[in-house]
């Protein structure tokens, strides 16, 4: 994703319920249509909003125009590297054995996940090249010392969008 002005990010902020999710999904669908080989896009949102992202994509877009992968819950469990396949020296610390399988994104062009999942699997997410990252309810990453903020900053992403329906300080 390149811009004429070499901007690396944007903020999309307005009141709740005015269509930010739809606007971002439309942008993603446009980017995929324009460049089918584009790197996947990452959407990080609170757990309470993940289903909204899925519902909006199903409601307004054909399944093939926005191939989605939800990296949360049961779907996330199927993407994990089994603990017994990780070096025994790392197995002693549960925080060090949270990895996702190689090529875990598959054919998905949009990956939906939570802030907690991004934090817990930061190395696997950071190992993936992303064309776009959307942080929904971006106030979750305003504390620079927080682990979730650090995980978000480690992502290998070309363009970032902070999205919020909460007044920005």
Placement of each model-derived feature along the sequence:
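ASCE P-loop NTPase motor core, strongest for the SF2 helicase catalytic module
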Residues: 1-169
């Amino acid at each position: 994703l390149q811009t004429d002005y070499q901007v690396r990010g944007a903020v999309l902020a307005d009141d709740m319920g005015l269509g930010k999710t739809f606007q971002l999904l439309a942008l993603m669908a446009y980017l995929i249509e324009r460049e089918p080989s584009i790197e996947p896009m990452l959407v990080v949102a609170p757990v309470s909003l993940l289903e909204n992202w899925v519902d909006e994509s199903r409601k307004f877009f054909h399944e093939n125009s926005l191939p989605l992968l939800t990296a949360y819950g049961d779907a996330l469990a199927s993407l994990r590297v089994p603990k017994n396949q990780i070096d025994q020296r790392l197995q002693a610390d549960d925080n060090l054995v949270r990895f996702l399988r190689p090529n875990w994104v598959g054919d998905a062009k949009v990956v939906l996940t939570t802030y907690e999942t991004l934090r817990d699997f930061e190395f696997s997410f950071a190992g993936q090249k992303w064309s776009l990252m959307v942080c929904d309810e971006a106030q979750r990453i305003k504390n620079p010392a927080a682990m979730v903020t650090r995980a978000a900053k480690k992502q290998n992403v070309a363009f970032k969008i902070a999205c919020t329906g909460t007044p920005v300080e």
